[in-house]
């Protein structure tokens, strides 16, 4: 009879472990990875960029203190992915993120989103709601005591039931009131066995809200239970990503429209149409009057090169197109010769910028090393120099380049002149029509630049601006 009590004692020791065994069995059978829905851009933004050299925590710190959350990490990874692969984010040129503001209504957390910063020119492609799903709260096992006359004196446990389903509810709000309004959408979710981030496609909800002009939305993760009052970590706050295609991004001056926060020239500092070296005070005279327009973007006095070498002499005969006509030798009359002499005297007597000679020689020597013919020159733009670094997260600077140089006749093949530029250079060389300028050295092929910045509501925005960096130059 001695072994009987021992077996009962062993069973009573194992009984408290039954709920844990059941929970482990359910977790082992139902374990799944993070469900990032079917949005390829969102999934690749967080899971496909593990080869980044910069850790997510360090990258998120670029958004400022307290911003090391998932939305910051997600946007930075989307930016890094575009820089590496060059693929448009989500098939468009714009990604907007919207942070949530938490409010407690009827002892339940409700998240509010302000989507009013979306521009009218931005055509919504897809939208995703990203949220952290808490691990399920399994009901406790209830003990069922045996009756006093039962032969089996051991106690039994009632198997715990399944956790409650999670309901995701979206409502639109009126801008004049803070109450929840029209129901925009609802979906039932099964809580995962462990806490993880999930994403749900809410494109139809966002498009309908924008069509109705109601861009103040609320989202509620309802479990049917009251909130226990445990504060939610700031890193687990939900957010919305909207992938759009900005139809106005190719318009002139689009980069300044979206990135410039204030006028770089305050009132009184600059007048449109005024000469660059003019002064508001008529008594002040500047020693900076250039006699002729710098059509080739070169420094004044660059022609004073020690070794006289025209740009055409630097090219072989085969580098030019064959000429179907004879050499051009325009005949000048007395009036033209007299006018030319006057222009020469005026140019010689005019003054240039009043820099010291050492600085001018250094600048000229730098340009002497560069080809005189139209070509691409190096230019690095630092956003801090133009006052945009306060809201631009990345890049801090970029290689913009620029085009400079002469497009004189005959133009070599390397400058890739257009047909119009070729005809214009011939007419100028003949000299029959006075006042015809040289063709201009302008960008031919340009590259896009992805910029990650903060909008007026401190939400991270990724935009891909076209024609930001010069790749090749040509005469036009």
From Swiss-Prot:
Gene3D superfamilies: Cystine-knot cytokines (2.10.90.10)
Pfam family membership, one: TGF_beta
GO cellular component: extracellular space
Residues in the signal sequence: 1-29
Alphabetized GO MF terms: cytokine activity; growth factor activity
SUPFAM superfamilies for this protein: Cystine-knot cytokines
GO biological process: cerebellum development; fat cell differentiation; negative regulation of ossification; osteoblast differentiation; ovulation cycle; positive regulation of osteoblast differentiation; response to kainic acid; response to transforming growth factor beta
Disulfide bridge positions per record: 374-441, 403-473, 407-475
Disruption phenotype: No visible phenotype.
Pro-peptide positions on chain: 30-366
Protein location: Secreted
Record region (Disordered): 39-63, 268-301
Tissue-wise expression: Highly expressed in epididymal adipose tissue, brain, bone and aorta and to a lesser extent in liver and spleen. Expressed at higher levels in preadipocytes than in mature adipocytes. Strongly expressed in glial cells of the cerebellum.
Keyword terms, alphabetized: Cleavage on pair of basic residues, Cytokine, Disulfide bond, Glycoprotein, Growth factor, Osteogenesis, Secreted, Signal
Top-level taxon: Eukaryota
Glycosylation sites noted in the Swiss-Prot or TrEMBL record: 114, 152, 277, 467
Annotated function: Growth factor involved in osteogenesis and adipogenesis. Plays an inhibitory role in the process of osteoblast differentiation via SMAD2/3 pathway. Plays an inhibitory role in the process of adipogenesis.
Similarity-based family: Belongs to the TGF-beta family.
The protein's assembly and partners: Homodimer or heterodimer. Can form a non-covalent complex of the mature region and the pro-region.
Further information: 3T3-L1 cells endogenously secrete biologically active Gdf10 as a unique complex that contains both the pro-region and the mature region.
Record's protein name: Growth/differentiation factor 10
Gene: Gdf10
